[in-house]
């Protein structure tokens, strides 16, 4: 049988390579077949590859691995954009070019030209196909008999002889929670065995357990009078004042506390949550925010402040820009209003120190822009920590 010319292993597909036994400095080409590739050294193969051009290397790579299955589909297509760009990318010009090309390009020729009124293909008729296959009496000629009750007797015997503990697990797996208590049901779902604590029968009594006693939180025992005196004296050790949940403190004492806090240059946290203060007592906080360079956290949640006063408090933080956390949620008037929300949003965007704001905005735009402003402030803090200029 003669060898075909297109055979891959024919003599025409051999290539020349320097012999491994030839002397150094001489290059005597010799034909190497597939069986002789094992005798070649790595240096000879590297020399052959280095002499190939880029196009030849690409063809060789396609022959060895036309479609690398180890790569994801998005990386299998090789770069075919070798042509240099003629100019900057302009989307409008590209769309106009594609539109003009689509209008001027000739449509594909149809093998069967369109003729009005002519139907192509077979029209589907569900009734005709069904009537042709089904008999007149509506039954199949050779019905298939399926017996689903072959193992009914064995199943009954297994259920009768099964212990009640296994029946409890089976009821839990089948979701029959009405005949089980909660520990039995959840143990069956998790695959845990029933024990004496949960009960192994349907009528078993579950053992009681002593509930864990959680002690109540102690009352706030802050001495308001002592805080007022220490704030007036500008005590360097007093950096936090917390009178949360102290509704029995009189309004006059709260006003005096806020006025005394304005004299302190070392206070960092001031909490007045759930103290039933209104706008008349909280107006002094505006002066406190504008004059205190050390104040970092202000908490006035769960009070009776109006949205207008909250907007003024946020606007006053722009004077020193030292407030890091501002909490004012859960007020009597839950709806702030669109105009007030926009005012608060702009104040937060202008502030470069706020990191946490506890206010519920109803507007989607306000929530989105406030979130972006706080992210920018966090980025400034990160750049300062790395020793970079946040304004660059």
From Swiss-Prot:
Biased composition (Polar residues): 16-29
Pfam families in the record: Tropomodulin
The keyword Cytoplasm appears for this protein: yes
InterPro entries: LRR_dom_sf, TMOD
Spans through the membrane: none
BP term (GO), one: embryo development ending in birth or egg hatching
The family this protein is said to belong to: Belongs to the tropomodulin family.
Name of this protein: Tropomodulin
Origin species: Caenorhabditis elegans
Origin organism lineage: Eukaryota, Metazoa, Ecdysozoa, Nematoda, Chromadorea
Gene: unc-94
């Amino acid at each position: 049988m003669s060898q075909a010319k297109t055979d891959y292993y024919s003599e025409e597909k051999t290539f020349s390579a320097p012999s491994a036994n030839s002397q150094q400095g001489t290059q005597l080409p010799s034909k190497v077949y597939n069986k002789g590739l094992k005798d070649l050294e790595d240096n000879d193969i590297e020399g052959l590859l280095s002499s190939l051009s880029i196009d030849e290397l690409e063809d060789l790579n396609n022959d060895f691995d036309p479609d690398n299955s180890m790569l994801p589909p998005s990386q299998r297509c090789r770069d075919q954009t070798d042509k240099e760009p003629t100019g900057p990318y302009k989307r409008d010009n590209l769309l106009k070019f594609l539109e003009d090309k689509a209008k001027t390009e000739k449509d594909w020729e149809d093998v069967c030209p369109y003729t009005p009124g002519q139907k192509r293909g077979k029209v589907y008729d569900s009734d005709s196909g069904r009537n042709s296959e089904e008999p007149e009496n509506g039954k199949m000629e050779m019905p298939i008999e399926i017996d689903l009750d072959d193992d009914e007797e064995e199943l009954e015997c297994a259920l009768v002889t099964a212990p009640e503990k296994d029946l409890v697990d089976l009821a839990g797996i089948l979701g029959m929670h009405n005949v089980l208590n909660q520990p039995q049901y959840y143990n069956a779902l998790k695959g845990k065995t029933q024990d004496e604590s949960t009960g192994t029968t349907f009528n078993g009594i579950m053992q009681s357990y002593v509930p864990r006693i959680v002690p109540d939180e102690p009352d706030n025992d802050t001495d308001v009078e002592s805080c007022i005196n220490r704030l007036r004296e500008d005590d360097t050790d007093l950096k936090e004042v917390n009178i949360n949940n102290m509704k029995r403190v009189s309004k006059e004492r709260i006003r005096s506390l806020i006025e005394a806090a304005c004299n302190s240059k070392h206070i960092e946290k001031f909490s007045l949550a759930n103290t039933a203060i209104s706008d008349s007592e909280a107006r002094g906080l505006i002066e406190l925010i504008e004059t205190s360079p050390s104040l970092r956290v202000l908490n006035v949640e769960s009070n009776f402040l109006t949205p207008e006063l909250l907007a003024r408090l946020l606007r006053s933080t722009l004077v020193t820009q030292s407030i890091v956390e501002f909490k004012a949620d859960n007020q009597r008037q839950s709806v702030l209003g669109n105009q007030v929300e926009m005012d608060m949003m702009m104040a937060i965007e202008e502030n470069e120190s706020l990191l946490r704001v506890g206010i519920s905005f109803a507007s989607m735009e306000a929530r989105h822009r406030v979130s972006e402003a706080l992210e920018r402030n966090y980025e400034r803090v990160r750049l300062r920590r790395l020793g970079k200029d946040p304004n660059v």
